[in-house]
Amino acid sequence: MECCRRAAPGTPLLVLAFLLLSSRTARSEEDREGLWDAWGPWSECSRTCGGGASYSLRRCLSSKSCEGRNIRYRTCSNVDCPPEAGDFRAQQCSAHNDVKYHGQLYEWLPVSNDPDNPCSLKCQAKGTSLVVELAPKVLDGTRCYTESLDMCISGLCQIVGCDHQLGSTVKEDNCGVCNGDGSTCRLVRGQYKSQLSASKSDDTVVAIPYGSRHIRLVLKGPDHLYLETKTLQGTKGENSLSSTGIFLVDNSTVDFQKLPDKEILRMTGPLTADFIIKIHDLGPADSTVQFIFYQPIIHRWRETDFFPCSATCGGGYQLTSAECYDLRSNRVVADQYCHYYPENVKPKPKLQECNLDPCPASDGYKQIMPYDLYHPLPRWEATPWTACSSSCGGGIQSRAVSCVEEDIQGHVTSVEEWKCMYTPKMPVVQPCNIFDCPKWLAQEWSPCTVTCGQGLRYRVVLCIDHRGMHTGGCSAKTKPHIKEECIIPTPCYKPREKLPIEAKLPWFKQAQELEEGAAVSEEPSFIPEAWSACTVTCGVGTQVRIIRCQVLLPFSQSVADLPADECEGPKPASQRACYAGPCNGETPEFNPDNGDGLLGGLQDLDELYDWEYEGFTKCSESCGGGVQEAVVSCLNKQTRELADENLCVTSRRPPQLLKSCNLDPCPASHLLSREMNEVVVLADELCHHPKPSTVQACNRFNCPPAWYPAQWQLCSRTCGGGIQKRDVLCKQRMADGSFLELPETFCSASKPTSHQGCKKDDCPSEWLLSEWSECSVSCGEGTQTRSAICQRVLKTGVSTVVNSTLCPPLPFSSSIRPCMLATCARPGRPSTKHSPHIAAARNIYIQTRRQRKLHFVVGGFAYLLPKTTVVLRCPTRRFRKPLITWEKDGQHSISSAHVTVAPFGYLKIHRLKPSDAGIYTCSAGPAREQFVIKLIGGNRKLVARPLSLWSEEEEALQVRKTNPKEALQTHKHQNGIFSNGSKAEKRGLTADPGNRYDDIVSRLLEQGGWPGELLASWEVQDSAERNASSEEDPNAEQALLHLPFTMVAEQKRLDDILRNLSQQPEELRDLYSKHLVAQLAQDIFRSHLENQDLLPKPSEQRFPPMAVPAHKHVSGFSSSLRSSSGEAGGGSRRPHRKPAILRKISAAQQLSASEVVTHLGQTVALASGTLSVLLHCEAVGNPRPTIHWTRNGEAVQFSDRILLQPDDSLQILAPVEADVGFYTCNATNALGYDSVSIAVTLAGKPLVKTSRMTVLNTEKPTVTVDIGGTVRTVRGVNVTINCQVAGVPEAEVTWFRNKSKLGSSHHLHEGSSHHLHEGSLLLTDVSFSDQGLYSCRAANLHGEQTESTQLLILDPPQVPTQLEDIRALLLATGPNLPSVLMSPLGTQLVLDPGNSALLGCPIKGHPTPNITWFQNGQPIATAPGLTHHIWGAGQILRVANLSGGPQGEFSCLAQNEAGTLLQKASLVIQDYWWSVDRLATCSASCGNRGIHQPRLRCLLNTTEVDPEHCTGKPRPAVQPVACNRRDCPSRWMVTSWSACTRSCGGGVQTRRVTCQKLKASGISTPVSNDMCSQLAKRPVDTQACNQQLCVEWAFSSWGQCNGPCIGPRLAVQHRQVFCQTRDGITLPSEQCSALPRPVSTQNCWSEACSVHWRVSLWTLCTATCGNYGFQSRRVECVHVRTNKAVPEHLCSWGPRPANWQRCNVTPCENTECRDTTRYCEKVRQLKLCQLGQFRSRCCGTCGKA
């Protein structure tokens, strides 16, 4: 066919219009897309193998933003990398090996399969647990997960299908085929049960062939699995599976788990060899093995290439076929191999056109190929349909369909079906006559023929066909009856009529006619027409009818009349009698069946016989109510005897008569069914009989495979039209009730749907928010906005924009938010001052009296009464107040009826209720401040917060938001005196930071911390408010006036109390806390009075005296509390207690004071004017403790300038710089000691308390040291390094590790972390990665000081888990020497004498342990006569030239600072030697030849071994000893048997038997046979021999010479060869196998093989020139003599000559218009000249046409 044609006139205009329209459309699309430029070229692939990524870019040509992305990706380099290339992620990690991390080089290994961020480069330092993210993104093309093709692109994990395409979800099927349907493999599953015997300890479980996948075996029982393999090259292997692990067996990965009660074997596959799973018997019990795997179908159909074209030019066709291919051997095999698998469907042939070029201009023609263009293609041809198998109701008819081919002469021949498979095969079966068969249709019943008593009624029954017409063809057997009896309940009072009144016309006539009608069928039958009218109007007359012989023609559904002799069977009557009613009132009896009309005799019978009731039947139920039926009998009225029922008139039979019976209730039974037609269920115990079984087995056979759908999953959407899925599995229900899951191809029925739509209703309207805009400023503080549209998702899944009033109100903060960029630099002012700042107030508020409204500033804590309105302000600087946001317990707060969030930076809570308690957070950009609100109940107790308002997640959130230092301090306080032991308070860092001051406030409220009169007035507060007119104490009223509405204290004051309490001994905390709380209450109240100018004079105070400090300081109150009066006296009566130093908080020190007095725990700063320093130290204890002072760890040297006062205080006069340091007060008695330090600094310079000692720890779980020394400790302990600093102002402490600054809390490595708390550094669970130099730097305005501690981690000597290194060292030291590894339990090595041996001492530890060798407990150097060498840093001991005997025990002792480890091994020198045992048994019991031969044994350590081991050892000389030298008793002597008398068929052989006696001298003499007969039975002297049959080969005569021809006149002839006896009895051929077998075939001369190939002359060439000329000739096999054609197979012994060849292969010179084929006239007749390919071949003829 031509690929293009010339356009018709007018086409250019159409094309131009189309191009213009296309350009407009394209331009509008470009406008919508934002005018993108064309995509650029693809970049280089990110990888050269293993699957990488390449990208392409485009740019936006519009000034507006363009829709869509400017980058696209595709996969590339999807070829496997060579094995030596390594993992791509590992290459990226190793690139960081030469980059120091925290000052140290590591070898980095990849960390794969991170579920949180698989596309970040996380690596682990080799040999440690340190995991670090070295880069936020891996290189493009890196696999997201090790077992997935998904790849990381630009830091995001992109889905990649098995077709290596981005975004593709195509996956491999169970057979490993990408996007396969699972048809190339089959599921194999089964169970094996061991039946091993004593003689057979191994058995084969299953053979799993090459290429199988997803193998899983589970063994349950005592036996053991092992593997045997065989590769395709024939190499065999075995794996014993001795331990759990992952092995590589013949390049297949095997995952084996050995559990106590079972073994599990998994192999993902595909297997690279045949695996034979075997079982080894290890126990008495049987084992079972369940296995499942997918086995590849190794024989599959493979489509062939196209066969040669049917024509060489001018257009032909060609087809493909399919061949069966063996995947293992890579060769084509017979088709039956592929037919074995039902999953294999042979592909249908494909047809395509070929050689479409026109043939050369010549008169040649292509006729050598088997197909030709000028005759039709092979086609399907069908025979006519057969007759329908059924005339109605649906039948089938069939026909034959074959593939035929028509040659150029028009001859049609059948060919192979595959030649026609390019078109669908016509159906061979079709349904026919699918209309319904005729059916009986009954009309309604007529009225009863009588008005009283018993009568008859009739109905019309019609045969109706599928068209609704009355016709024949219905079965007479299924016809409903047309007559039945009827009873009128009205009694008859007139004489009984002899016969019931029959139906009047037309009922009787019509029913009788229809009843006698016959159906027309496909067989000729007599069909009667309707009866004529009766010949008389009364009395008896006659009726006649016409009888026709008819047949039903099925193809036309019409009826044809036939001659009467065509119908078989009796012809129905054509005349009968009729009765038209009585004449003149007579009532004669009439029998319609009596055609003669003779009625005599009936009257007599009627008079003699009649029906009567005779009793009732047995009751149908024994209880509970049943029924009885009356028995109707035919009786002789004269004799009253039973008569035959035929003698009574049937129409007179009385109606059925029933009555009830046995109405008494039944006893209790399981089911009761009686009068009420109900079922009453009773208790099972009330039934006497055994209860029948309610369950029985049925249908105990496997069900056919069927689809089993699971429950529908949840809808993918809650509204707007979603999808829900379910699993639909093909399963087979087994006979035992279990289910077997099968591949889907096993279920023939159509698969139920696994997807369906759901939630097809509209969604509620909701806001759709855009992305946040860019910040409104380029630096500093700005805002971001975003737009919102109200949309609704309809039930169709389409989103539509709706009116914004339909969406809920949108909070202001949802559309605008603050943003902070880098601070804007301004000349002369630090940029940090421009960040937002919240002016917080760090106060504690306690409400004591009811107030309507209270105002607070964020930053503090408030303990308030319910129903109080609270206004909370958030004063900010450098921040716009409308942008302030509020949170409560981490949740964003919005305005409501109860809480108002004002746009001016404050929050208002109306009338507090318990749910309002919590943590309120004000956010101004990055600045955040909190305010905690707690509620006070009516009993002055804090109201517990509702559980639902505080979850563990919120707790964790608040702790993270709180300063970790404060959290640690909170933890410390809660573990102190105020902790009540609850779980929440013992959780340490996770405790609620809002509970920090609850205990102090509770004490203030409950434990009388207020002045006494004040408390009394407080307690009557509520009653005073409830009843203002009640008579109360006027003093209390006055005190109530003095009580503040809300008491205020600074948080710092409460923090000092908590810190002070935490430093007190436990036994003093309760007492101390009472003092501190009481002092706090007095200070708060006094501060309030001072502020109000209401402080009464001392004489007017009704409160206890309070200590007033020298200056006014509301929240920094302090007081020197002395011991209580109880402690002042009565020392002997007090219980014994260890010393405790009272820790007190002094007033703030003034640097200008000339005399400084302070308590312990403070810092003293020496100024130029300081003349004296007095350090107080108060201690309690029983016995009274003694006090001594040290400075910087050394005892204080007292002098005239440094004095010890009588109260144990230390006074320093005229202090100088040498006096600077930490002074420690030590209190000691017999029960223990206590010490507290105080720092004295120079002009406030920082001071660090140091210790220069080295601490070694190998056992304790915790180590605490002061900074300045060295700590050597084992792993896993918690190390605390105290850095106690002093300075005024307070020095800031900074920690460094290896000169790198440490944060407040940080994970050093996996499992270890550090925490900073009040100047101390806590290292938890230290390991080698924690080693280093830790430095503490104290700095303030006056200077800085740095001290360091070196931390060294020790590892005690231990046996390493991996022994490959020392084994390699042993192999390198002595490749051929026997070696043994020492162990703590001891090992043993057995050696030959003179051998050398290597002993390895596997050890690891830090620092490297020192190894010492011993023999028998003595140092190896002092061992006598032992040649030894120590190599490998002491780990290898070589001992040489070991002599015989045990060498004793060798041991190696490894020791370092962390501990020691002793390992042992024993060397045993073995030797073989000969041993002479007792004499062996005498060789004879009598005669002169008996000797005792001494027995030699080869021994090894007293154990007998193979004598070969003693070869070369000197044998002991042994001499035989004579024994049993005496006369023997008489015995029979026999000679050898003679030769058999016959070689087959049974012969005889003989021997000589004599009785002889052997003397002690060795001479044997004959004696009488009787002497031997007394001792033993005489042996036989004759026996049969050669009993086997005599056989020979026999053969028949040669058959005719008619076998296959093998040459000219040469054929093959045969004869039979069989085995038989000499008697002619035929035997199996095996009986004659020992004899040479005669030949059964030979060559012979045959006239039939006198044949040869005969060829005709070549035809004319199809072309005179060119490359397409062919000629053919006839080739046939003919007989030489007759010259007639014979079958070609007779000539097959010779090569068949060619029947076609090319010709006239020369270039054509002229191109004139002429015909090149002789069929051009037919081309013109068929009007094919309009086709180009014919027009060119028949140029001349078509030109004339």
Curated annotation (Swiss-Prot):
<dbReference type="GO" id="GO:0030198">
    <property type="term" value="P:extracellular matrix organization"/>
</dbReference>
<dbReference type="InterPro" id="IPR050439">
    <property type="entry name" value="ADAMTS_ADAMTS-like"/>
</dbReference>
<feature type="domain" description="PLAC">
    <location>
        <begin position="1709"/>
        <end position="1745"/>
    </location>
</feature>
<feature type="domain" description="TSP type-1 9">
    <location>
        <begin position="1649"/>
        <end position="1709"/>
    </location>
</feature>
<dbReference type="InterPro" id="IPR056272">
    <property type="entry name" value="ADAMTSL1_dom"/>
</dbReference>
<dbReference type="GO" id="GO:0062023">
    <property type="term" value="C:collagen-containing extracellular matrix"/>
</dbReference>
<comment type="subunit">
    <text>Monomer.</text>
</comment>
<dbReference type="InterPro" id="IPR036179">
    <property type="entry name" value="Ig-like_dom_sf"/>
</dbReference>
<feature type="domain" description="TSP type-1 5">
    <location>
        <begin position="607"/>
        <end position="667"/>
    </location>
</feature>
<feature type="glycosylation site" description="N-linked (GlcNAc...) asparagine">
    <location>
        <position position="251"/>
    </location>
</feature>
<feature type="domain" description="Ig-like C2-type 2">
    <location>
        <begin position="1139"/>
        <end position="1241"/>
    </location>
</feature>
<keyword id="KW-0393">Immunoglobulin domain</keyword>
<dbReference type="InterPro" id="IPR013783">
    <property type="entry name" value="Ig-like_fold"/>
</dbReference>
<keyword id="KW-1015">Disulfide bond</keyword>
<feature type="glycosylation site" description="O-linked (Fuc...) serine">
    <location>
        <position position="310"/>
    </location>
</feature>
<dbReference type="Pfam" id="PF05986">
    <property type="entry name" value="ADAMTS_spacer1"/>
</dbReference>
<keyword id="KW-0272">Extracellular matrix</keyword>
<feature type="domain" description="Ig-like C2-type 1">
    <location>
        <begin position="836"/>
        <end position="938"/>
    </location>
</feature>
<feature type="domain" description="TSP type-1 2">
    <location>
        <begin position="376"/>
        <end position="424"/>
    </location>
</feature>
<dbReference type="InterPro" id="IPR013273">
    <property type="entry name" value="ADAMTS/ADAMTS-like"/>
</dbReference>
<feature type="disulfide bond">
    <location>
        <begin position="538"/>
        <end position="583"/>
    </location>
</feature>
<feature type="domain" description="TSP type-1 7">
    <location>
        <begin position="763"/>
        <end position="825"/>
    </location>
</feature>
<feature type="disulfide bond">
    <location>
        <begin position="549"/>
        <end position="567"/>
    </location>
</feature>
<keyword id="KW-0732">Signal</keyword>
<dbReference type="Pfam" id="PF24484">
    <property type="entry name" value="ADAMTSL1"/>
</dbReference>
<feature type="glycosylation site" description="O-linked (Fuc...) serine">
    <location>
        <position position="391"/>
    </location>
</feature>
<dbReference type="GO" id="GO:0005576">
    <property type="term" value="C:extracellular region"/>
</dbReference>
<dbReference type="InterPro" id="IPR010909">
    <property type="entry name" value="PLAC"/>
</dbReference>
<dbReference type="InterPro" id="IPR045371">
    <property type="entry name" value="ADAMTS_CR_3"/>
</dbReference>
<feature type="compositionally biased region" description="Low complexity">
    <location>
        <begin position="1115"/>
        <end position="1126"/>
    </location>
</feature>
<feature type="domain" description="TSP type-1 8">
    <location>
        <begin position="1528"/>
        <end position="1591"/>
    </location>
</feature>
<keyword id="KW-0964">Secreted</keyword>
<feature type="disulfide bond">
    <location>
        <begin position="874"/>
        <end position="922"/>
    </location>
</feature>
<feature type="domain" description="Ig-like C2-type 4">
    <location>
        <begin position="1378"/>
        <end position="1468"/>
    </location>
</feature>
<feature type="disulfide bond">
    <location>
        <begin position="49"/>
        <end position="81"/>
    </location>
</feature>
<feature type="disulfide bond">
    <location>
        <begin position="60"/>
        <end position="66"/>
    </location>
</feature>
<dbReference type="Pfam" id="PF07679">
    <property type="entry name" value="I-set"/>
</dbReference>
<feature type="disulfide bond">
    <location>
        <begin position="1283"/>
        <end position="1336"/>
    </location>
</feature>
<dbReference type="InterPro" id="IPR010294">
    <property type="entry name" value="ADAMTS_spacer1"/>
</dbReference>
<dbReference type="InterPro" id="IPR003599">
    <property type="entry name" value="Ig_sub"/>
</dbReference>
<feature type="domain" description="TSP type-1 3">
    <location>
        <begin position="436"/>
        <end position="493"/>
    </location>
</feature>
<protein>
    <recommendedName>
        <fullName>ADAMTS-like protein 1</fullName>
    </recommendedName>
</protein>
